[in-house]
């Protein structure tokens, strides 16, 4: 197998991987070809967005052998064919296993900052790449954070400025603003002369049913299970509203004016990064509590302090 430049290994979900995209684009520009081992759906997305040149399915049985005593020869060939391997993982054991296979440079970076470390996840990734001398802190003279310097508008030239996409789901229901509030926002947006379309993933079809049964708003509804199809759809929109979710991170990265509704999670770490992002979040002493596992409110009080008018004002402030 021909030797290539950089292999990324990331076991995380959509939001975690999208948070690395600004860094991966910098690496690709500097080193050339790049591949990633990750979930298939995310790998297809990364290829669709031209973040990587190739991807390998993390869920394939061959890669499961990395955690066994007998590693699949195909996996060995893949790992040995890249000059640099960047492993986003907390696992020292996995790092040790990869070291036993490849003679090339291997760098392990924690995929998220430690609890209590007040740094954005994208800045955390970039800072560690600088620490490993894989990137230079090239923007120190301008004062522009590394994580902000590569964002642009990746939408289709024919995008519809009147179309607002709404994704009311998240990886955890504890991070979801009530769907009834999203419906109220959608109704107000339509009353202002814009179009609204809702997006639901496979784990959110129950929310989709609630929306369809409510009959309180007339809007297109999309049930999507392929992230690359989601990306194509987002590229056609004029704005986006969502929770603290991987889809919100993706929308912001693509360049949509994005409103992200935050409750118990911390926007200092997880705010979507893009050219036009507004976070709506109440100022409560108990927040953020999601990362520490101390969420104790039955109704999650922080979401109760966010009103449809707040979110409507935020999206209108971005798209008019």
List PLM regions with ranges.
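Catalytic machinery of carbohydrate-active enzymes
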Residues: 1-320
